[in-house]
Amino acid sequence: PQTVQGFCMRIMQGEEYGKLYQLSEFATHGYRILTIGREPDNLLPVTEQQSTYVSRHHCTLETTPSGDHWIIRDGQWQKEQKVWQESSNGTYVNSAQVTQQGYRLKVGDIISIGDVKMRFENY
């Protein structure tokens, strides 16, 4: 049996095709909540210059203390306004819309945000 060392997200479609985000590396360094979006202040900034379908603060990934699974949620917590703000165009996993309540990712899942598609993988 294959030993899983960690989890990552690989961009499969979009301006940064092939880019790899090592999610487990973030978790190792104490980051259990990762933000994804167009703005550079996200822990996982996604470049989308051809359109603006990816929100500035699009979605959130969260892991357990053990790092054995990840949950994706549409939107991000906005500290200043003290409110959860959903993305403009939604977050999808395998073409199904994800809400703020979240979805537990499985290896091979395809995440779509705007025109960008990413695959959840293990290594």
Question: Where are these predicted regions, by residue range?
Answer:
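Intrinsically disordered, low-complexity acidic Ser/Thr-rich regulatory segments
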Residues: 1-52, 62-67, 106, 111, ...
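Short, solvent-exposed loop/turn segments enriched in Ser/Thr/Gly
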Residues: 55-57
